[in-house]
């Protein structure tokens, strides 16, 4: 065959083919280097075709690793170049490598910029353009300044100090001079001061329209110089917001990072802060929405600024007496709230002795109220309490409750008439019965209407647990046990009678008063206990046997102050209060207005 390959050997020679086909080391040494490589490669290729299971041919990888490293290096250089353009905004980088790499793309982008120069969206989306003449150069400079400011904020060791310094250099005023300090981001406030650094002009103008819907007053101004740009906002929201909420709102609205914001509540007490905002509002570069807040007008108006506010303690006492505030915490809180409309309250907040004034005011009000209460007769006092009750009520709810307990209302009215007069041996009413029969509900509603006090037997080991009897017209001891009744039988027989008793008061001398009418609720029937024999004549009992809770555990009866008001008005004559009421009206005591402040009505200036 013409294409027959391989060696020709004679089969009669036996194993002599081994000598013919074998490779010798001496042959390789005599061969040329290039020829040896070619022969070995060719031999390996031929051998690999005949391999059956194990491939011992040599493998050549080529330069794949070098190509991979070259591609990685090129991709890394492109990423670094893009990062420099985004962070630094360098015109040299954008006009250097990028212009040399894609000149056609640059020319197209520049042509698009010239065709659509009036479109604001293109200016925002493509801020980095080749510097040209006019508007394009100015826009590029602004973007470069913003990027440079962001870079300074990132590189600065103390970003807060850098922002405070930039704010003071632009507005010639410290940021802390116009703001207060809130340490908790959850504290809510309506008036906030915001400083934004590196804000683009398009977002500054758009934020004015977006924030007007959420604010009752909005004032904003933006300034810039070679160090960067800063915009300051005074925002009075319609509802109180926390710093965290305002920060998220403004960061999304202005499209800036939270690191570029400084946010604190407005300083409403300070002439310098008010003048700063008032002067800024007069500038034509300031955008303003709504009327100036009251705290700015009050401190910048000529009359208010020249007027010297002096605190008058008597005016404060008169205010607390008119509102019936006798607790120190209530007086302090409510009078601080009145500072917006009361000049004396503002002067009170400016004093350094607020705690002393509040304590003295509460003491004086308690003295006045106690003397006023003791000066009134029981009919006049009940009439005054009826004026304080609001709403519409019906005396029939009380009638229905007594009928439900199988008690005649006329019996309760006769006992109540003697109880209100404080007649001896009729000065204590006890409501006896099993639990959940409405005893405490009835007595607590009556004591609340009369403005009485509640005594807790848990404090009986204290010498002063009866001190509140000196300042009240009626008292209640709820859920009296055997220990309480034994205490009454041992120490308070004259108090149950309604005779004068001596009351020990803390840090004061003991006072002698007539024991006020007393209500007692208990599960123990005193009349059936022989051990309380001496209390039988001193206590008038009413037994409640019917439970006052339905299947769901709720109480169907609810007696309010308006119901007691209707009850007393309806049964005023039957309670024998007419004569004393007419006498008080003729004397004019009930119509007299009490004045505890030094009002100089006839003074001559």
Curated annotation (Swiss-Prot):
Its main location: host cell. Disulfide bonds: none annotated. It is found in: Host nucleus. One of its GO terms (cellular component) is host cell nucleus. The modification Phosphothreonine is found at residue 102. HAMAP family: PPV_E1. This is Replication protein E1.
